[in-house]
Amino acid sequence: MGKRAAAIALMTALVSGAALAADRPGQTFLLKPSDLPKPYATPPVANRNEVIPRPGNAMPQAPRGFKVTIFATGLTIARFMAVAPNGDVFLSERLPNKITLLRDSRNIGVADQRFTFADGLRNPSGVAVHKGYVYISDQNAIWRTPYVPGATKAGKLERVTKARDLRLTAMHGTRNFAFGADGALMLEIGSRDNVSDFRPGAEIFKVVKGELLPFASGLRNPVGIVFQPGTNNLYVSVNERDGLGDALAPDFFTLVKPGGFYGYPWSYTGKNPDPDMGAARPDMVAKSITPDVLFPAHSAPTGTLFYTGDNFPAEYKGDAFVSLHGSWNTSKPTGYKVVRIRFKDGRPVGGHENFLTGFWDGRANPFKVWGRPVGLAVYRDGSLLVADDASNTIWKVTYQKQERSL
């Protein structure tokens, strides 16, 4: 091996090792708007991963004291989940266009039964159990059917939204929704393009008597949408735009204010003008709200929830979890993990920390990925369920009570 080849190999190993080290459970990150480079500080790249079968007995890594097990596997593009009062788990599976019901009939922490609860959908995403109904969203509508404990097949689906369909945009197809403490139903619709001012899209709507009423805008692809428990405080995790370099624009998690504008397409991360769009609407740049928590650009946040269970240590109660589905267009891979956002006095403290990692190996080129976390749910025993649409597995993360030594 020549000196140049040896140097390249050493640098590759160092970069890969750093990437893996940056994925340790418990490691904390604080990205500030003042830390951001100028647009095009690095060239835009396409750096797609190679998805591989899960190697041997590889498992996601969680902080000390937590145990990771398999709740269900052999799924097909496992996306988002909801846990019913009786412990059944409703899961959206994208390509089969169906909602699957998973049941742990023996109460051993493994789904030993599965049923097709609803099919014939179009790219289903969101699912929830709310006030006697199972709600499902796809690109046609939000639907609902009566929740019958123990039933394994949905009754007739009733359309909740009146729009002809919810496809509306071609680029971002997820249609997640959330219910507030007052019963308000919110729906997210992502943008049609990477960067454009096409509407509707890049918005959150309030669903009132089936009509979609604008609630907040400037949110390019707000996949993760959730109310803080017991409140009407709506939080969202957003996939920002591509093409500005490795570090731009940061994805984010933030409180959504009624009528709030969060930048897209005119600006990013507050009042940073988009290099192609910003000059046309300085008024919109000036009114853009800076988000609460920033993630590295291209991390692709998806599933988002607040922890409400009793299994985890008390300090986790009320904190948020966000799954980062992972990058495709940055020279250094980012995401592929679940992160925790600590809250204090009802508000996020600013940063985030690794919670569930180990889904990829940066030592190969192209880098190899065997897991991509998406949906999150709190199971009936207080454990955290994580849907993974690469290994098509639902992971179960349980805290093992530590006995005090004598």
Predicted regions and their residues:
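Surface loop/turn motifs at the tips and blade-to-blade linkers of beta-strand repeat domains
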Residues: 70-75, 115-120, 160-169, 214-218, ...
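Conserved beta-propeller blade signature
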Residues: 88-92, 133-136, 143, 184-188, ...
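Blade-loop segments of beta-propeller domains
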Residues: 78-79, 99-132
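Asp-box/WD-like beta-propeller blade repeats and closely related beta-sheet repeat scaffolds
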Residues: 114, 123, 128-130, 140-180, ...
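Beta-propeller domain segments
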Residues: 22-63, 174, 191-194, 202, ...
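Structural WD40 beta-propeller signal
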Residues: 74, 84, 130, 178-180, ...
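Short loop/turn segments immediately following the C-termini of beta-strands
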Residues: 93-94, 139-141, 147, 190-192, ...
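Hydrophobic core register within WD40 beta-propeller blades
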Residues: 81, 127, 177, 222-225, ...
